[in-house]
Amino acid sequence: VIYLDASALISLVTGRPYALELREFLAQSPEMPMGTSTIGFIETVRTLDRVGTYPTAMHDLLAAFTEILVTDEIRDWAASLPGGVRTLDAIHIASAQAIGDELAFLVSYDKRVLDIAHSVGIPIAAPGMGR
């Protein structure tokens, strides 16, 4: 599973910086499932509402990405992550962590998310960002 946080989803949908590199990265494993937390769907749609008109965003995201529900385990992992990470970002990291051995990468364009995810042993990727 390739987990995308909201920063990656927004780049992918809007064509923001690194969108081309992200599309190329994802195209390398077309059979690999992609997922995000329930929080990822909400964050992405709320941001898209502010930056443009994307009337089918939620439908499109739900069709392309597996939704990872916030469980007690994810809640507890998110609460116990090292300091320096925002609440929603902690939920993304914990959601990726919950995928376990099936997780190929957590994709993000947020340096704090990448640093903390890496520090707890999660494989990370930021295609085009030079990490």
Over which residues does each language-model region extend?
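Alpha-helix capping/helix-boundary segments
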Residues: 8, 40, 74, 92, ...
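Acidic catalytic patch
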Residues: 63-94
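N-terminal interaction/assembly modules
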Residues: 42-45
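Short beta-strand scaffold positions
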Residues: 4, 36, 69, 87-90, ...
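Short, well-structured N-terminal submotif of metal-dependent ribonuclease cores
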Residues: 1-36, 47-62, 121, 128-131
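Acidic, PIN/NYN-like endoribonuclease modules and their adjacent C-terminal/linker elements
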Residues: 1, 37, 97-131
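Short active-site oxyanion
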Residues: 30-34, 63-66, 100-105
